[in-house]
């Protein structure tokens, strides 16, 4: 019995060797058709172009959503009129991404300036395990203020 156990253990031990082979690199493949844009002008406050793969949902004249079902993403847009309250709107826009600071590893900012059209803004990339990975605001500093998040 002792020899049988020893020989069985030896056979199992020697038969469990395998040659290690390197695994090929895997890449994420996202196939989306070429983007085709259409104008969105249903709100009196602002207009923009969006991809026709998105579905637009209008909650009211100030809030709307762009839903991309194939990408499982939603872009939330919130419009505010500027009425001598640009400071408070900017403070709120800067506070919003930093609500995720407990889950975020970092929140780099990217400033957007288009002096020809008078549009200014900031894009916040929330790196880490946060509910909203990208947040931004755009304004002309006079009449319009748009906040968005993905």
Task: Tell me the role of every PLM-derived stretch.
Residues 16-73, 81-90, 99, 105-116, ...:
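N-terminal targeting sequences that direct proteins away from the cytosol to non-cytosolic compartments
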Residues 119-135:
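Short, Gly/Ser/Thr-enriched beta-strand-loop segments that form substrate-interacting elements
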Residues 136-138, 147-148:
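Short, hydrophobic/aromatic-rich beta-strand segments within well-structured domains
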């Amino acid at each position: 019995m002792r020899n049988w156990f020893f020989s069985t253990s030896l056979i199992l031990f020697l038969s469990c060797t395998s040659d290690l082979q390197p695994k090929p690199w895997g890449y994420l493949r996202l196939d989306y058709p070429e983007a085709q844009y259409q104008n969105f002008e249903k709100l009196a406050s602002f207009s923009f172009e969006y991809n026709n793969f998105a579905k637009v949902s209008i909650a009211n004249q100030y809030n709307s959503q762009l839903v991309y079902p194939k990408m499982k993403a939603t872009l939330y847009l919130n419009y505010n009129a500027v009425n001598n309250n640009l400071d408070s709107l900017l403070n709120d826009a800067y506070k919003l991404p930093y609500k995720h600071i407990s889950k975020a590893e970092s929140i780099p900012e990217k400033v957007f300036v288009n002096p020809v059209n008078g549009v200014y803004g900031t894009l916040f990339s929330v790196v880490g395990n946060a509910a909203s990975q990208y947040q931004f605001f755009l304004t002309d500093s006079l009449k319009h203020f748009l906040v968005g998040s993905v």
